[in-house]
């Protein structure tokens, strides 16, 4: 429970939720602009490397500031090797397997459709958790999985014209959801620093390095033409770093410490709605009856699962930059 004396004002909660809804919902639109002229994995690697370094630098600077002023809080502890290993594995799963695959898929898939498919991650998370704990998934989880898969299946049906979606791109996005769910589960049980912000900074730093290494190894550097880079791509990348990885993430952490985790979890199904609306408004993405039906099935399944069952600490679905965080306590 959150102490009554620590309950924030309604405007503060609304502002933080609005930031998470709008910024994380708009990251899919930003990605669509980034991959127009920047290599997807290298761009993602730069994003998370810069964000991770910035977050760790902030934590170190804040720790020194507190020490100089004699503020009595637990100091920042340098991570152990086993914690860096966890950060590397989680970073690879979430940021290479998750975000990196989204970057690749959005070269052929509309940003709104990408967001809708990624919204199925909580469904996979629930199913994988049930398998690991050897507990039978609830009827709600099974129903949500079937309805969500039905929505994805509708997107894969053969079609033509505006109603056709690249099946390879759809498949890559499904792989991304599986990686996101796997990384979230591993982060929940693997050793990480007590400071959740430090753990996330480590994951971003490690994941960014993995993304850069893979991008170089598959020849993205050789295919990159600096002269072809557009202003829209650079602005999109800057938006992802500053707002997606830092501003919205800060609001997300604040919410986890001040409101119920079920309230924070609403972004899991609000974000795809925002992404679809922005894709239509700014990129002229077309909403056909088939894509609307698929989106309704997928988002409906996620709404039912997110709002209809107890949640473990930190389980709030896919975010662009974080695996799991505790919803209460002192997040350093």
Model-derived features: positions:
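Specific transmembrane alpha-helical segments of multi-pass solute transporters/efflux pumps
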Residues: 23, 27-28, 56-118, 154, ...
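Specific alpha-helical transmembrane segments that line the substrate/conduction pathway
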Residues: 42-53, 94, 99-136, 141-145, ...
């Amino acid at each position: 429970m959150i102490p009554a004396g620590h309950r924030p004002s309604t405007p503060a909660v609304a502002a933080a939720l609005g930031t998470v809804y709008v910024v994380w919902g708009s990251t899919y639109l930003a990605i669509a602009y980034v991959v127009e002229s920047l290599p997807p994995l290298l761009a993602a690697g730069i994003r998370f490397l810069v964000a991770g370094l910035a977050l760790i630098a902030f934590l170190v600077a804040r720790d020194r500031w507190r020490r100089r002023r004699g503020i009595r809080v637990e100091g920042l502890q340098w991570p152990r090797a086993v914690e860096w290993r966890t950060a590397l594995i989680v970073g690879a799963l979430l940021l290479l397997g998750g975000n990196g695959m989204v970057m690749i898929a959005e070269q052929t898939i509309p940003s709104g459709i990408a967001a809708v498919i990624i919204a199925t991650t909580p469904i996979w998370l629930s199913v994988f958790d049930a398998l690991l704990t050897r507990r039978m998934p609830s009827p709600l989880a099974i129903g949500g999985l079937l309805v969500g898969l039905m929505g994805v299946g509708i997107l894969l049906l053969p079609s033509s014209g505006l109603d056709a979606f690249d099946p390879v791109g759809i498949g890559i996005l499904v792989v991304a959801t599986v990686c996101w769910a796997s990384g979230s589960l591993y982060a929940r049980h693997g050793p990480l620093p007590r400071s959740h912000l430090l753990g996330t900074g480590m994951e971003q730093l490690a994941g960014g390095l993995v993304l850069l290494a893979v991008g170089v190894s598959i020849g993205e550097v050789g295919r990159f033409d600096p002269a072809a880079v557009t202003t829209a791509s650079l602005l999109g990348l800057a938006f992802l770093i500053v707002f997606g990885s830092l501003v919205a993430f800060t609001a997300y952490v604040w919410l986890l410490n001040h409101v119920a985790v079920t309230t924070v979890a609403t972004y899991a199904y609000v974000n795809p709605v925002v992404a679809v609306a922005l894709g239509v408004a700014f990129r002229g993405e077309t909403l056909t009856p088939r894509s609307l039906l698929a989106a309704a099935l997928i988002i409906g399944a996620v709404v039912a699962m997110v709002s209809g069952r107890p949640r473990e600490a930190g389980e709030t679905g896919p975010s662009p930059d974080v695996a799991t965080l505790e919803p209460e306590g002192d997040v350093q």
